[in-house]
Design a protein with these regions (language model features):
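Conserved phosphate/oxyanion-binding catalytic-loop motifs
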Residues: 50
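Asp-based, Mg2+/Mn2+-dependent phosphohydrolase catalytic module
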Residues: 2-16, 21-42, 55-75, 82-264
Length: 264
């Protein structure tokens, strides 16, 4: 593994779940990391596969934890999904299973809801997920709708442990229809390029930070960025042995970054 000169990096793309917080609890060192980003005038963007929350809700969540991060510093897989659909098929219609973050993102890009003959079936994390909605989605795909997933995460951390995430929820539709979904969140390079463009950075000037090898690290690596795997979420050091690629740096948590930057 290499080292990273964090002081020399211009932009930071950072995951949230398992990196900044776990459920409704802020992780050790997260506040110090965010304050360091702000105090040193780094460009930063929280790039999350969480499709359920809007940027405003994410801002409010961190505010309740004592952190002030403006809404423009969040980019979610729901926003990436809405951008993809608006670019591919302006004015299209969808049957969507998801929370406010996904539904609002779709509406904001002029995408309409349609449960009769939609162009796409779009699935994100959804508390309303049920056998009825699953059956509806399956039959719409069989009738010709294209299947879209907000992200390819199979699970995510919660206060209770682990919860199934988007890929686990969309899998029954894939199996029942024989159709493969297209996933818009990390590690899709479209989401990474959008993040870099929002930061105003080239890949060599940026760092990708996350707790997952299969989304965060690979997306950063394939985009040409330095990568940091933190062990505060779903990964352990043993996780590294499961993959053919490696992050640039492995840290216990993001709180290590300002400490390493101070050491030079």
């Amino acid at each position: 593994m290499e080292t990273i000169d964090f002081n020399a990096k211009k932009g930071f793309l950072c995951d949230m779940d398992g990196v900044i917080y776990h459920g409704n609890h802020i992780l050790p060192g997260a506040a110090e990391f965010i304050h360091w980003l702000q105090d040193t005038h780094k460009e930063y963007l929280f790039l999350t596969n969480n499709s359920g929350m809007t940027p405003r809700e994410l801002h409010q969540k961190l505010w309740r934890m004592g952190l002030d991060v403006p809404e423009e510093h969040f980019y979610t897989s729901a926003l990436a999904t809405a951008t993809f659909l608006a670019d591919q098929a302006p004015g299209c219609s969808v049957y969507a299973l998801g929370e406010a973050g996904l539904l609002n993102a779709l509406y904001d890009r002029g995408i309409t809801m349609n449960d009769v003959n939609p162009d796409y079936v779009v699935i994100g994390e959804a508390r309303a997920y049920s056998l009825d909605t699953l059956t509806k989605a399956t039959n719409l795909v069989l009738a010709g709708a294209k299947l879209i997933g907000a992200n390819s995460d199979t699970c995510g951390p919660t206060d209770e442990g682990i919860a199934p995430a988007c890929r686990a929820l969309i899998a029954p539709v894939e199996i029942a229809t024989g159709k493969q979904a297209y996933f818009c969140g990390k590690p899709n390079p479209l989401m990474m390029r959008t993040g870099l463009r929002m930061l105003g950075c080239h890949s060599g000037e940026a760092v990708m930070i996350g707790d997952r090898m299969d989304t965060d690290v690979i997306s950063g690596m394939e985009s040409g960025m330095a990568t940091v795997l933190v062990l505060s979420g779903v990964s352990t050091r043993a996780t590294l042995d499961e993959f053919a690629y490696r992050p640039s740096v492995v840290l216990d948590g993001v709180g290590d970054i300002p400490r390493l930057a101070q050491q030079g």
